[in-house]
Amino acid sequence: LEKKPIIGADLIEAYRVNGWWVVDKKGAHEVGDLVVYCEVDSWIPHTLAPFLTKPGHYPREYLGVEGERLRTVKLKGQLSQGLLLPLVEDNSEEGQDFSEILGITKWEDTRYMANMDARGNFPDFIPKTDQERVQNLDRTLEKYFGQSFEVTVKRDGSSLTAFVNGEESGVCSRNVNLKETEDSAIWAAANSLSLIPKILSTGRNLALQGELMSQKIQGNYEKVQGIEWNCFDIYDIDTQEYLLPKERRELCKQLRIPHIKVIDDAFVLCHNVDQLLEMAEGPGVNPGVKREGIVLKSNEAAFSFKAISNSYLLKHG
């Protein structure tokens, strides 16, 4: 744990955990302390932190639990992302996960998924589409300095995975395997792009993963007309490995599958967390749209992460 004063603030100061800055009461923690850090987009039960609910308001409810979602905020000009709590156990160790003990879950926007029929759970032979945030890799990045990375735009939509595994095929949202119904926008998008037939044409067991955007998803932040889907990953189910960026791009071109926008296909990593967060700022794909952030994937190894634009988080996150 590190800390620094906030100019013009007498009662609060900024504390740094890994790559995250959190504003808390002055003197609440000391340099080197072990604390429980709750990341942005955590759902914090009201019983754990009632002060997160605005005075005079009732707590919100998510998955049957009253509480609040942690968002990115600015206090006295200082970015604050997360919440610091005292240790739960005296014999706690660095890196220990207390989410289950404290009843903290990850918040996800379920409004768009409310009317979707699940065929089953997300397949256990495919990883879910989730990248680690760069702030959690503060001590890891140096291991990859000098390596070549692909840098792509991160778009604000909904995850779509189409797969073929032997006789089984399907289309999934971020968390579930979906039934093919007439009103399923995800299945409609997969069918319009012939994703499953295109996988079958390769003779391989693959999962195509990408971002689905439309006028009905996430308030159409990306300002798309109709439906757009961009592939950002291809997973080889037999080898249980993601294709490296170059092979993925080549296969997308061969199959005529729309690929996510590439900013740099040979970016040499030698940047710290703050520098990568600065890189996350910038234009998106469509005119007048700022990007949600960037995703970096090693051209040499199975290592990838995301850097989300702080200006995006302050306005939309």
Go through each PLM region and give its residues.
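Core nucleotide-handling region used for phosphoryl-transfer chemistry
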Residues: 1-317
